[in-house]
Amino acid sequence: MRFDLENQAYKSLPRLLERDFGITVKERLIRRFIKNKKGESLEINIIGKGEKDGKEINIIGEAKTNLSLRHIEDFLDRLKDIREVIDGEILPIMVTHMTEPEVEEYALKKGIKVYYSYEF
């Protein structure tokens, strides 16, 4: 399994989140599993904590080489489970090498920020 896209994102997202949202990353961005309310493991590609204006922000992200509408729908479903076990505000992000314009528009309408690998 390759994690190149995620590994690039871990290094560059702190700068991008500061630039775009004024969020300072306070807890290293990592890949890990968390348990949902049913006790099932959920893989989180990008997870960490940030801060904006003294308020804690949970950074939750998914990495997909070629982002599709289906990936966004799956991520939105996963976010529902995550919100049940993580307190506080969540900033959902997706990182990708490429996607179609309408897919990025859909993500933005759903409140998901999309970052491209060329921004890293």
For each of these PLM feature ranges, what is it?
Residues L13, I44-G50, G54-L69, F75-K80:
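Conserved catalytic cores of phosphodiester-cleaving nucleases, focusing on short active-site segments
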Residues D4, Q8, S41, R70, ...:
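Charged, alpha-helix-enriched surfaces in structured cytosolic catalytic cores
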Residues L91-F120:
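Domain-level recognition of nuclease-like catalytic cores that cleave nucleotide substrates
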Residues K80-G88:
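Arginine/glycine-rich "motif VI" loop of SF2 helicases in the C-terminal RecA-like domain
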Residues N58, E89-L91:
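Residue-level recognition of the N-termini of beta-strands and the immediately preceding loop/turn
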Residues K37-G39, I72, E104-Y106:
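Short, well-ordered secondary-structure micro-motifs
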Residues M1-R32:
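Acidic-basic catalytic patches of nuclease active cores, encompassing PD-(D/E)XK
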Residues V25-G54:
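Active-site metal-binding core of divalent-cation-utilizing nuclease and nuclease-like domains
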